[in-house]
Swiss-Prot record:
The active site is at H9, E87. It catalyses: (2R)-2-phosphoglycerate = (2R)-3-phosphoglycerate. Its EC number is 5.4.2.11. GO terms for biological process: gluconeogenesis; glycolytic process. GO terms for molecular function: phosphoglycerate mutase activity. The gene is gpmA. It comes from Staphylococcus carnosus (strain TM300). CDD domains: HP_PGM_like (cd07067). This is 2,3-bisphosphoglycerate-dependent phosphoglycerate mutase.
């Protein structure tokens, strides 16, 4: 039976400062490192053997993956990185304090941007856009696929092709697969796997640094899930 382990990265320094992060490549906080290493210890204690791992190209997810694999003595496991597993792009909100954004735009508007399924925040500024296009992580990509802002729906539409092309084929061979990513890219996968409604998925909370283990049937249908 295929097993899928989803893990949201440990707390980042911008999570701790209550800032919109998105594609900004910030590091884990000390708490985030502790969350990831503790979960790696749990993987080892439970004897969970991972066959292949996937993560984004953002360091907070990559480092979480490393801590999970290092603490469970599984650094040899093949690891694949893709921009398609990045966090939702928060456009012009990136770098703003969430409370300050509520004061500037209004609490209701910020809530709509954060918790609507198909409404994106304002586009990235020209400076932010230039930085994304110049980032080595995205060299070789058609600039049209690099977002200026995303809704959760937009995030799902870039995540699911990677699920279909890279992740699902590994699961279909019966492997145990780790996906260490971000709150919204994982929401996209959860919506796809469980068939969660548009209305319900936006409020779905995912713990930081805590492996969420899915048991799937041979056709990758949802059977059960639990946090480690």
């Amino acid at each position: 039976m295929p097993t899928l382990i989803l893990c949201r990265h440990g707390q980042s320094v911008w999570n701790a400062e209550n800032l919109f992060t998105g594609w900004t490549d910030v590091d884990l906080s000390d708490q985030g490192v502790e969350e990831a290493t503790t979960s790696g210890d749990r993987l080892k204690q439970e004897g969970i053997e991972i066959d292949v791992a996937f993560t984004s190209v953002l360091q907070r997810a990559i480092k979480t993956t490393y801590h999970l694999l290092e603490r469970s003595n599984q650094l040899f496991v093949p690891l694949y990185k893709s921009w398609r597993l990045n966090e939702r792009h928060y456009g012009g909100l990136q770098g703003l304090n969430k409370d300050a954004a509520r004061e500037e735009f209004g609490e209701e508007q910020v809530h709509i941007w954060r918790r609507s399924y198909d409404i994106a925040p304002p586009d990235a500024t020209a400076e932010q856009r230039e930085a994304d296009l110049a980032d080595r992580k995205y060299q070789g990509l058609d600039e049209r696929v690099i977002p200026t802002s995303e809704s959760l729906k937009d995030t799902l539409e870039r995540v699911i092709p990677y699920w279909n092309d890279a992740i699902a084929p590994e699961l279909l061979t019966g492997k145990t697969v780790l996906v260490s990513a971000h709150g919204n890219s994982l929401r996209a996968l959860i919506k796809h796997i469980e068939g969660v409604s548009d209305e319900d998925i936006v409020g779905y909370e995912i713990k930081t640094g805590a492996p969420l283990i899915y048991e799937l049937d041979d056709n990758l249908g949802f059977v059960s899930k639990h946090y480690l």
